[in-house]
């Protein structure tokens, strides 16, 4: 057991060294119990590009909550950690660092550059693991993986070769998205489209015979040197007679043909379209149909090449200005029309993406997508939480394009294809035998390897690997909605293809972390928050509590320091009530407490408040477990918060002082037992969310680690509706008196007469039997409880279920003000009656709702009507006083 709890909650003291202790105790490893049901999660591998942000903290907190609860519930749990090499992002970071030293990757060469990247990886992997520790993540480091590990690399090569041999991976020259900053191809989903201010540049292309000019328009005039034709619609009467003739390409005076193609829309612009097959996907298709040449006028860094004539070597955007100026000087510029249009930008480097003709490797997606779609029509489909994201997944799969998987980078999985001087190509998991072969210099898209993450980390392609057999498919994936297509969909179709099984049973989708104003956190806005700074100020438990309670599945969460203050205050409350309970524990053990609690629920010992709190605890266990199972951590947190702060701390702990400050030692032992038992159950319920503080408090009274303690379960013997109903009525009475005092500014310390009128004999007996609690909380000079109480002439009155409460206030009350208060109360009951009446008059509701739900509404109606009638009566009495 640990040392005594400090007088003040200090998260730094509580959390210091605790994580290392857990690691030393090996409590995060699978139990190895073959009789237990396995439950596995693979961590979405963070990029080794830098520190983790709040989004990572949220993502991993949710996973840790799940795995810690399942571990406590007796599952054989595995949470497998790892990191992603993040090809383009990491290479860009390392190149940026080298540029600061005046070095480029080309100065170093591939091998030495990769040495630098591995150094970067080691540096930031250590940083990430340190952050995981501060967050308290219960991962099994003995199984840590990296996407460039040899085992994972072997899986990548096998998948590539198998897909190639099936004809589902092919190499070809097509228009792709090109990042001129990173000098690599990008897939469609790595391109972010933004609305930007631009212009349509209208130009005249003169017919070769000089008889007339055709007007064309483009937003990218710098690509005109790659024009190989102009197209008109074959049905466009304006140009039918021109088909087959030539126009002269301005500046370089090159003749190009006029072709007939339906790509040209007679209703749009002039109906004449310039065709640049090497720089536009639609033009590429036109070029294929008409067997047109492909003229690439741009270098891979976004500068113009020698085919751009005098603009050779200029940046594409500088060339745009210069070309327009030249066209104007030649008389070919007709007009410039400002416009706002959508322009693709690289997700990683932020630069404008260039459509560019390039030889790349592609995955043919037709059948892979069909397999994924078909799987979602089975009973064993992947369940999305919330379910609406299944529609998002299906929509993407139904509209998927072939996936460009090659990247012109050095950091990553080098494509397992080799070429020789004879123009032959060899694709295989290992290099071909013999000399004269050169491996393809490109690497695979990072998502190609991370798509294999759930099964490659478990030992696949060795299907006899122990972890693969035991923990695959995994149980739950937690991730953000922004990478459903990037990652989730690809894991699903790759897993179905190569293992015959889906990679996980559930996908929990969370949103994005936003600032207090609802803005996405970003470097450009300067509103990003380092989770380590938050932990330093508030502790990891407070951050985890906020992150788990911030929103529902699929929703964004707004970060605020006000919410962090509230989180810290809640933990401080738990700390203080724990200190109170443990300071009054008198050496009671948890086993002794359990034995005594069993007697309490069997009504052998204890009082009604003991049975009430145990009943409510049992209900809380059921509701929290139910919501955990649905990944509704926010709902579960609200239930826990209400039980701990309101029912346990504010009511039960205060009620126990009546016993603990008495001389009855037998009753004290029972009260201490209920307090300790309830605290223990609370800590176990909280542990998945707040691992550090619960471990610290648990260590005061129990042996071992709470990490491996059993999770609370619903116990039918704890149910006691009589105790629940009675104490809730008692609370209503006390609250009513307190509220009445407050309304007329009568201090709690001032004794006052309290009259409780009830015709319910059971309630009357209950109030009398427990009048000690009423007196303790309301400070009456006189307390009368009876059905025969005469209504006082002038009194504060209130109505609770089954009783009326009067506080005679002849010397303290303004009658007119009391009458106004009652009118307000009457309006409140009328509003409640209108609402419930509207619901019960809805035939559809009555017909479709569960009978118990309808009955609950009817009970509400009866209760509200009783309160309404009693309030009417009091108003009439008060009016008599006024008269």
Swiss-Prot record:
Main location: cytoplasm
Main enzyme class: ligase
Motif 'KMSKS' region, residue numbers: 520-524
Residue span of motif 'HIGH' region: 46-56
InterPro entries named among the record's database cross-references: aa-tRNA-synth_I_CS, aa-tRNA-synth_Ia, Anticodon_Ia_Val, M/V/L/I-tRNA-synth_anticd-bd, Rossmann-like_a/b/a_fold, tRNA-bd_arm, tRNAsynth_Ia_anticodon-bd, Val-tRNA_synth_C_sf
An annotated GO BP: valyl-tRNA aminoacylation
GO cellular component, one term: cytosol
E.C. code: 6.1.1.9
Quaternary structure, from the entry: Monomer.
Role of this protein: Catalyzes the attachment of valine to tRNA(Val). As ValRS can inadvertently accommodate and process structurally similar amino acids such as threonine, to avoid such errors, it has a 'posttransfer' editing activity that hydrolyzes mischarged Thr-tRNA(Val) in a tRNA-dependent manner.
Protein name, as recorded: Valine--tRNA ligase
The encoding gene: valS
